[in-house]
């Protein structure tokens, strides 16, 4: 897998705790995917072998990424996901804002066993993402 950033690894103990507490690991939602490091961890360590992961991201970065070269970000995400996905797992992605992606997810009537909110880091956006996701 090809990652240029690691903003996730410090979360692994918390993710392991959550995975151990879950009764069902069939449907996961991730808001904010970037290169897919958390997505890949979920695919390899949490999600059932026949589970479904929905990733929502614009793949354009935000204010905090202004000085980063994001060329190829979406392609890198796709390649990382392809490498991490197990046989019968399904990975869907909505390449849009979290607001639009979550509105679409709500209309699909899926219920998620695990939701990871890591899109925009502004308080109003995080609150909106959390409320819409649950």
Feature annotation, model-predicted:
Residues 2-134:
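S-adenosylmethionine/decaboxylated-SAM
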